[in-house]
Amino acid sequence: MAIAELRGQISPEWAVVNGHHLERQVKLKNFGQAMALANRIAEIAERQGHHPDLLVSWGRLTVTLFTHAIDGLHQNDFIMAARIDALLRPSVP
């Protein structure tokens, strides 16, 4: 599947950077919330065996996804992005 097709399956908040990686910044209220989200993403990453780069700063988490083995984007990066999107979606009671 082409990047353009896969791109349509994830949140528009993800940027495709130089055709090489996906990046999304999530704004949060404080450092603790950013760290908590990073830990939740880490749990998903461990289960999937696909690990994003996570940059935690005050009130912000930057998530970067690419496949190291090919030094670029793979379908697995988009699958992981969709899983992160699901985590960030507000739950409906």
What annotation goes with each model-predicted range?
Residues 1-93:
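Long, contiguous binding/interaction regions
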